[in-house]
Amino acid sequence: MGKKSSKLKQDTIDRLTTDTYFTEKEIRQWHKGFLKDCPNGLLTEQGFIKIYKQFFPQGDPSKFASLVFRVFDENNDGSIEFEEFIRALSVTSKGNLDEKLQWAFRLYDVDNDGYITREEMYNIVDAIYQMVGQQPQSEDENTPQKRVDKIFDQMDKNHDGKLTLEEFREGSKADPRIVQALSLGGG
């Protein structure tokens, strides 16, 4: 991606209109806003956390924002270029349920081994609880560990202590509240 330019090239726009759910006009608008917030064309992890803090002032979104940042940063170079940003935004804001669940699975599967372990699930659920601050939950979900236990009871069909993409997808579709919780962090 080399040197960052403030002008969006037509081939980049064409690629993004093909690869995302955004129109050329929307892409140009998002690019303008992106450059306003990130004049050098790169969004750092600290900048990303700062954005989340604006939306979740009552909690601490730092941990969750860092985890989401990792999924946005497709090439793992420590910053988010506009193309990475718009592709992730397309899925999280306009994608269909399967695309959103695939994206969420990548978020939860921190080590990218194709499974979500209890520890990985706990990591995300704990980050979400920190982000939203204290909100009343039912007795069986009032701690991150209880929430993880409940999710695994529902989703881990073969009881091997880890979730495959298929188990995650089916379990999420069977429980609309899980999908609602996912959209909390998905954008």
Swiss-Prot record:
Q: Which domain of life is it from?
A: Eukaryota
Query: Residues that bind Ca(2+) 1, according to the entry?
Result: 73, 75, 77, 79, 84
Q: Which UniProt keywords apply?
A: Calcium, Cytoplasm, Lipoprotein, Metal-binding, Myristate, Repeat
Q: Enumerate the residues binding Ca(2+) 3.
A: 156, 158, 160, 162, 167
- Quote the record's binding site residues for Ca(2+) 2: 109, 111, 113, 115, 120
- Where does the signal sequence lie? none
Q: Where is the EF-hand domain?
A: 24-59, 60-95, 96-131, 143-178
Q: Give the tissue specificity.
A: Enriched in synapses, such as the motor nerve endings at neuromuscular junctions. In the embryo, highly expressed in the ventral ganglia.
Q: Which InterPro entries match?
A: EF-hand-dom_pair, EF_Hand_1_Ca_BS, EF_hand_dom, Recoverin
Cellular component terms, GO, for this chain's entry?
cytoplasm; presynapse
GO MF terms, alphabetically ordered: calcium ion binding; calcium sensitive guanylate cyclase activator activity
Q: Matching PROSITE patterns, A to Z?
A: EF_HAND_1 (PS00018), EF_HAND_2 (PS50222)
Q: Which GO terms describe its biological process?
A: chemical synaptic transmission; neuromuscular junction development; neurotransmitter secretion; regulation of neurotransmitter secretion; regulation of signal transduction
Further information in the entry reads: Binds 3 calcium ions via the second, third and fourth EF-hands.
Q: Which family does it belong to?
A: Belongs to the recoverin family.
Q: How does it assemble?
A: In contrast to Frq2, does not interact with ric8a.
Q: What's this protein's name?
A: Frequenin-1
Organism of provenance: Drosophila melanogaster (Fruit fly)
The record's gene field reads Frq1
